[in-house]
């Protein structure tokens, strides 16, 4: 399908997509979010990425989920999204929910991973620069860091909101107990956590044991990643493993 160079969003894009509140907040997210984990790096044609993003937005997908290390290489998904954002979506920024994260390895040295205030603030600044944005709508701590006090990590998230870098903050892959601890600290600081992003699929149902109830009790929304088990729950692998697939490229 040929796409015009100048993008005008579909006028009917909100008619069929359901939108749900995230926890106890007023933030509404679409039932489907587009994650940019593996398919928006420099190993994919930019025009293909552009078509995917346009198609998603035209169908009411307003939430685009990124992280500092998405690619490959690391950082390239945000940079590519920033290019497309500037070309196609700048007039629609107020209609988009853009999220980023930090926590996993991003660069060598002691300041390139984890949950320290140093890493999270610097990473958020770098993500904003790559995407050409003044702020992100949601910023997550990407994974628990046993080497950093949870008080420091949550205080850094609070700072990102108070400094205008993020509107909402959340966590990813936290256990129920750690989620409760983090939310207690966040409430005391005055910036409650809005959302939790765990892995969840028919093959991976760990959040049903306790996390879903914990998030409901704590007023947090839940948004799953890898809901199709990175393609294993589709027909992608019924006839073998294509070399171009994530499994074939050892990206799972």
Protein language model features and the residues they cover:
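Conserved hydrophobic residues forming the short capping helix/wall of the S-adenosyl-L-methionine
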Residues: 85-89, 128, 161, 183-186
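Beta/alpha (TIM)-barrel catalytic core signal, keyed to glycine-rich beta->alpha loops juxtaposed to Asp/Glu
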Residues: 2-16, 144-252
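Conserved, mostly hydrophobic/aromatic
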Residues: 22, 34, 49, 56, ...
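Short, well-ordered coil/turn segments that N-cap beta-strands
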Residues: 27-32, 60-62, 90-96, 133-137, ...
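N-terminal small/glycine-rich loop or linker at the start of catalytic domains
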Residues: 23-41, 99-112, 135, 140
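Short, acidic/polar
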Residues: 43-57, 114-132, 179-183
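N-terminal binding-site loop/beta-alpha segment at the start of enzyme catalytic domains
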Residues: 1-96, 162
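Alpha-helix N-cap and loop-to-helix initiation/capping positions
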Residues: 44-48, 76, 80, 111-119, ...
């Amino acid at each position: 399908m040929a796409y015009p160079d100048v993008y005008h969003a579909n006028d009917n894009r909100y008619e069929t997509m359901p939108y749900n509140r995230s926890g106890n907040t007023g933030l509404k997210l679409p039932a489907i979010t587009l994650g940019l984990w593996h398919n928006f790096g420099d190993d994919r044609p930019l025009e293909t990425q552009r078509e995917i993003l346009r198609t998603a937005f035209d169908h009411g997908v307003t939430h685009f989920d990124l992280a500092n290390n998405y690619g490959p290489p690391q950082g390239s998904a945000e940079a590519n999204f920033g290019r497309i954002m500037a070309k196609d979506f700048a007039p629609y920024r107020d209609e988009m929910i853009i999220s980023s994260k930090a926590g996993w390895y991003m660069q060598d040295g002691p300041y390139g991973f984890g949950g320290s205030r140093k890493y999270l603030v610097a990473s958020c600044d770098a993500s904003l620069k790559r995407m050409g944005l003044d702020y992100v709508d949601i910023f997550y701590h990407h994974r628990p860091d046993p080497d950093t006090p949870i008080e420091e990590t949550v205080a850094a998230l609070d700072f990102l909101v108070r400094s205008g870098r993020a509107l909402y903050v959340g966590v990813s892959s936290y256990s129920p107990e750690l989620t409760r601890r983090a939310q207690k600290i966040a409430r005391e600081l005055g910036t409650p956590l809005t959302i939790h992003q765990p892995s969840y699929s028919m093959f991976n149902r760990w959040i049903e044991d306790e996390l879903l109830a914990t998030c409901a009790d704590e007023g947090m929304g839940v948004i799953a990643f890898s809901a199709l088990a990175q393609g294993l729950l589709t027909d992608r692998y019924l006839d073998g493993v294509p070399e171009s697939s994530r499994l074939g490229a050892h990206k799972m």
